[in-house]
Amino acid sequence: MKKKVTTIQKFAWFYAGLFFFVVLLGYIPGLTWNGHLFGIFDIDPYDDLLHLASAIWAVFAAWYSLRYSIFYFKAFGFLYCLDGIVGLIFGNGYLDLAIFLHGIYVADLSTKTALNAPHIFIGGIALYIGFILSKKYK
């Protein structure tokens, strides 16, 4: 018997696709300039591994169960939001090890915002899915 895939699990499948796509973007000719995706986001093997691991984690969560998908969104959302906040303050985040490898990145607030807003936004949506949207499944 085929088990029903919930909306939460569908969101996890979407996140998996999103992160696989982000990894692929870095390898499309014409989208990177001097190692920066769209001329803004520094792309290196650590970023690729982070996004690939995020995608694989989302695939496993979506495939395994609703309960694990909810856990994924709570944990992932917390980690990504915190990474974005750390990046906003210090210029580099911790998930891709940049703060440890390169230290504090001195930049103006608009640059730091452009670099870290995606993690805060994606993490915030994940937190919403994990803590708010998931309530209808309890």
Question: Which residue ranges define each predicted feature?
Answer:
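Membrane-interface extramembranous regions
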Residues: 1-138
